[in-house]
């Protein structure tokens, strides 16, 4: 039994991170569609009979009917594949939802908030989703009805949340899930992929197949699974999608003496055009770092943000000449430096000086 498992595509969600780049948000929406097309093409090429979409397929507040029609058109291209959709907290099963009002392809089954079992050949698929934008009901007690069949649970929510967590979205316990005897538990809601192995049982978050910001770094993709009909042995593969990813790039700017040097330093880096970058500046600087100005001076469209984590470089000898509190601090540190012998002690004193100067400059 082969399947694809995905979640959290958030179709038509506003790409706030890309808002200041001309046409980037529209391009990202097109990329979202293309990611779904990639998965459908994979299904066609590999003859996959099941497609699981575990919540937040689209963004209820922003979704366009044209997008729904496009996605449904893709679903019609795979008539022999059974498609199961779980409504999530961003696309709940509510009165004006396209899940309720749109005529979907005949191979699509949409779950509601009530637990339901769908029988398919040698497979029983259980599922339930959201009927509102927030749902913190405890996970319902579920036991599989026929252990001889392959049993799959699909839902959307938080797994093993802390007692201190303020908002819990359909909280679930891995211990209870394990006891319920499912052969595969496909989840959505967490955008980072996670395979949890509980005594051979897989509880899987596929992660989002396309990221929308720097809180979702690195490669994105979907899960391809296979459960042996006889042994029920499970194998999983993560398949990357081609959409642009978000990455962080740490840059030591110590050797930049002027703002222009820093701009040139960044422009000389060979960035991957299929990635969006946030540059994090480290090291020391001896000029005021204006990240917005530097970003505007760059010739690179895929640099989205610059964050300054560098520290000011202080000339302790020059500062000691000042008639000020800063000068007194510098003189005091210089006197102490003459009295210590080890490099470690000197480093501690210089760090104390930097902390003091940073405090003065706040």
Residue spans for each PLM region:
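Short coil/turn segments at beta-strand junctions that form active-site/ligand-binding loops
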Residues: 1, 47-49, 81, 149, ...
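N-terminal active-site segment of His-dependent metallophosphoesterases
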Residues: 1-70, 350-355, 359-362
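Conserved beta-strand elements of the Class I
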Residues: 4, 124-126, 223
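His/Asp/Glu-rich metal-coordinating catalytic cores
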Residues: 22, 50, 59-204, 208-213
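A short, well-ordered alpha-helical element
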Residues: 37-47, 142, 256-270
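A conserved active-site cap/scaffold subdomain adjacent to cofactor or substrate pockets
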Residues: 188, 194-258
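Accessory, non-catalytic peripheral segments of nucleic-acid enzymes
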Residues: 229-362
């Amino acid at each position: 039994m082969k399947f694809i498992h995905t979640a959290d595509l958030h179709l038509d969600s506003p790409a706030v991170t890309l808002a200041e780049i001309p046409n980037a948000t529209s391009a990202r929406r097109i990329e979202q569609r293309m990611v779904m097309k990639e998965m459908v093409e994979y299904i066609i090429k590999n003859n996959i009979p099941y497609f699981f979409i575990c919540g937040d397929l689209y963004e209820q507040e922003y979704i366009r009917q044209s997008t729904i029609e496009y996605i449904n058109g893709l679903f019609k291209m795979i008539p022999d594949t059974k498609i199961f959709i779980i409504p999530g907290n961003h696309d709940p099963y509510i009165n004006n939802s396209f899940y309720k009002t749109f005529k979907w392809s005949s191979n699509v089954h949409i779950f509601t908030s009530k637990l339901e079992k769908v029988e398919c050949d040698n497979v029983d698929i259980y599922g339930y989703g959201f009927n509102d934008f927030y749902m913190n009901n405890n996970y319902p007690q579920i036991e599989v009805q026929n252990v001889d069949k392959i049993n799959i649970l699909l839902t959307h929510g938080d797994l093993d949340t802390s007692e201190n967590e303020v908002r819990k979205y359909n909280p679930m316990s891995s211990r209870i899930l394990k006891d319920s005897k499912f052969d595969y538990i496909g989840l959505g809601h967490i955008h980072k992929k996670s395979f949890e192995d509980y005594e051979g049982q897989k509880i899987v978050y596929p992660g989002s197949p396309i990221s929308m910001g720097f809180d979702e770094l690195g490669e994105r993709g979907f899960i391809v699974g296979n459960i042996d009909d006889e042994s029920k042995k499970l194998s999983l593969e993560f398949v990357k999608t081609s959409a642009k990813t978000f990455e962080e790039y740490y840059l030591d700017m110590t050797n930049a003496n002027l703002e222009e040097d820093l701009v040139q330093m960044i422009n000389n880096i060979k960035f991957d055009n299929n990635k969006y970058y946030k540059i994090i500046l480290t090291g020391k600087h001896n000029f005021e770092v204006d990240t917005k100005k530097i970003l505007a001076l760059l010739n690179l469209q895929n640099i989205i943000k610059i964050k300054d984590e560098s520290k000011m470089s202080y000339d302790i000898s020059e500062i000691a000449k000042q008639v000020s509190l800063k000068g007194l601090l510098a003189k005091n540190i210089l006197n102490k430096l003459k009295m210590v012998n080890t490099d470690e002690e000197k480093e501690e004193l210089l760090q104390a000086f930097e902390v003091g100067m940073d405090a003065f400059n706040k």
